[in-house]
């Protein structure tokens, strides 16, 4: 039985990734996230069916212990904006630093392991119809995007087996989960549901050889960001997360 390790399992995409892996019925699954009230509540439902662990991707010793025993790794852990863009070192520590620990462990202990890495399409900025070959230009305050781009470069230069998914705005329940809410009201944005995003990671395992050493833009539809916020207000009412989406309306989105 192949072994799959999921980092960032308590997030909107992570939860559904675990569900889809279980539905396949052919994997031994280990999941990890930071231990807090929210992650404990969201992951406890899986404790009888998967190996549930709590820890930090910046813990090099822990990463080495976990990586050496798995065939596939799905890396979803991230310092999401706006938090990830508030301090220059935060995204580099979590997104890049965690990725660096995993890449190092794979090279040293498990070079056949295949890494599926969650990156972001927000690095494209205002490029029309971007492709994975589009030239990326970031400013000095794009901490989150920079950490993802540097992680991609590290993966491509060091690993033999990897697949990178650049993920657009993820549609999730803003009352229960982190809402990826950064954007300009007039922008048309590529979007994907949390379910479709998770499914792409899980199905990718079956086609790892075909997808190896490739980068993909994920999306299922395009939507106007202002219209999306209006619909969320209509459906869910006024919430703190909706207010945050308004406060940071001129920022880049994840």
Located regions from the model:
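N-terminal Rossmann NAD(P)H-binding glycine-rich loop of SDR-like oxidoreductase domains
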Residues: 4-24
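NAD(P)H-binding glycine-rich loop region in Rossmannoid oxidoreductase-like domains
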Residues: 51-97
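Glycine-rich NAD(P)-binding loop of the Rossmann-fold in SDR/ketoreductase-type enzymes
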Residues: 58, 90-101, 138, 142, ...
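Conserved Rossmann-fold NAD(P)-dependent oxidoreductase catalytic core, especially the SDR/UDP-sugar
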Residues: 100-143
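Flexible, glycine-rich beta-alpha linker
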Residues: 124-125, 142-143, 163-182
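Active-site Tyr-X1-5-Lys
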Residues: 126, 139-163
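Glycine/proline-rich active-site loop of Rossmann-fold NAD(P)-dependent oxidoreductases
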Residues: 149, 172-182, 194-195, 204-216
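Mid/C-terminal beta-alpha module of Rossmann-like enzyme folds, strongest
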Residues: 203-254
């Amino acid at each position: 039985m192949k072994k799959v390790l999921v980092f960032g399992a308590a997030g909107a995409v992570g939860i559904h990734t675990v569900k889809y892996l279980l539905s396949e019925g052919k994997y031994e699954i280990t999941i990890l996230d930071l231990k807090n009230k929210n992650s404990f509540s969201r992951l406890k439902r899986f404790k009888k069916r998967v190996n549930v662990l709590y820890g930090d991707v910046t813990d090099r010793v822990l990463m080495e212990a976990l990586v050496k025993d798995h065939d596939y790794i799905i890396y979803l852990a991230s310092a999401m904006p706006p938090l990830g863009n508030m301090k220059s070192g935060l995204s580099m520590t979590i997104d890049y630093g965690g990725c660096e620990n995993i890449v190092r462990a794979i090279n040293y202990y498990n070079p056949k392991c295949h890494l599926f890495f969650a990156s972001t399409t927000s690095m494209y900025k205002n490029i029309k119809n971007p492709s994975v070959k589009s030239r990326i230009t970031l400013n000095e305050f794009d901490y989150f995007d920079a950490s993802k781009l540097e992680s991609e470069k590290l993966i491509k230069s060091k690993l033999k087996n990897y697949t990178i998914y650049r993920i657009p705005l993820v549609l999730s329940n803003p009352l229960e989960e982190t809402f990826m809410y950064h954007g300009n009201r007039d922008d048309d944005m590529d979007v994907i549901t949390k379910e479709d995003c998770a499914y792409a990671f899980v199905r990718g395992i079956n086609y790892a050889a075909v997808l190896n050493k490739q980068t993909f833009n994920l999306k299922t539809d395009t939507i106007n960001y202002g219209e999306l916020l209006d619909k969320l207000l209509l459906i869910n009412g006024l919430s703190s997360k909706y207010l945050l989406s308004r406060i940071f309306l001129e920022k880049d989105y994840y």
